[in-house]
């Protein structure tokens, strides 16, 4: 699963560093195990049922850790929960969801949903309503969960000083003292900045909400360059992230131009003025594709998994 996600570095892929994963980043450790247990079936008899049980127990523990994070219920003053690894864990959970998201939650008390019985209407729209409930609602729940997790990740990033230019104001290194090198911590911090920018802005446009990230901070992150001296040999993450950042900025420009408000968008479509704007953005999209998808025939795992989501019809119409 790691090659399909741009969130984690290769540091914890080394077995020699698993001790630090367990002791320094407990939330990230539990999240990795929880997500892996959903998609990896254990060998032997009863592997699928054991896999289901392990995933459910790990998800319960992840929920407890998130509750501790939100309500500040750390068991000691030297907490391991408020760290860069927890931000990475929240990003992972917003990208790879637990199985129980689409099942009714366990209830140990009064639930108003049990009192309000659904209205049964025998009408022509019943099949459409059923389709909405079966197909659209699960996707909506996924987006809602991701939105809340990303909000928590952004809040924790501000608390730790992830976006501060002055390292003296940062509070994200104390957890890793004596275990992880300063260069590795700095690299993870810079990666988290860009990942939050991309994930929050793209999800905000998809669900029709205002981005949680202030405009000034978005410009600052987009303008910062990650030092390639910190990257690992052969790491294609920087090239992929540069292309993703450029595409995100371009998508934001399209959204701000075409859809600043419902009335303005309707006026644009009725007047036909949007045709000239389409030609303008088509040129920019072609330039982006030439810069990031065609040179040297390079295709990283990130590009294959991320940009393959662009529909072929969109490629034909835009590119």
Predicted features and spans:
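A short glycine/small-residue-enriched secondary-structure motif
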Residues: 53-68, 86, 105-129
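Intrinsic, low-complexity transcriptional activation domains
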Residues: 1-7, 16-23, 44, 101-104, ...
């Amino acid at each position: 699963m790691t090659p399909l996600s741009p969130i984690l570095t290769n540091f914890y892929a080394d077995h020699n560093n698993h001790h630090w994963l367990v002791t320094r980043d407990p939330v990230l450790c539990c999240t990795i195990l929880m997500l892996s247990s959903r998609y990896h079936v254990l060998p032997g008899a009863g592997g699928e049922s054991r896999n289901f049980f392990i995933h459910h127990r790990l998800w319960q523990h992840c929920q407890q850790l998130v509750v501790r994070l939100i309500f500040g219920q750390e068991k000691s003053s030297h907490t391991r929960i408020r760290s860069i690894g927890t931000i990475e864990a929240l990003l992972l959970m917003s990208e790879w969801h637990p199985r129980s998201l689409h099942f009714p939650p366990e209830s140990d008390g009064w639930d108003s949903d049990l009192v309000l019985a659904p209205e049964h209407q025998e009408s022509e729209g019943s099949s459409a309503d059923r389709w909405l409930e079966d197909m659209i609602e699960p996707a909506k729940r996924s987006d809602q969960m991701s939105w809340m997790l990303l909000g928590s990740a952004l809040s924790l990033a501000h608390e730790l000083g992830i976006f501060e230019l002055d390292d003296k104001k940062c509070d994200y290194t104390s957890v890793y003292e004596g275990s992880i090198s300063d260069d590795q911590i700095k690299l993870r911090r810079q990666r988290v900045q860009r990942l939050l920018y991309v994930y929050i802005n793209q999800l905000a446009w998809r669900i029709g909400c205002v981005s949680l990230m202030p405009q000034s901070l978005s410009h600052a992150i987009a303008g910062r360059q990650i030092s390639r001296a910190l990257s690992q040999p052969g790491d294609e993450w920087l090239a992929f992230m540069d292309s993703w950042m450029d595409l995100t900025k371009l998508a934001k420009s399209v959204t701000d131009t075409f859809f600043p408000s419902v009335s303005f968008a309707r006026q644009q479509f009725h007047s036909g003025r949007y045709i000239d704007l389409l030609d303008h953005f088509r040129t920019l999209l072609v330039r982006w594709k030439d810069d990031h998808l065609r040179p040297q025939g390079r295709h990283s795992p990130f590009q294959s998994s991320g940009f393959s989501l662009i529909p072929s019809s969109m490629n034909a119409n835009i590119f």
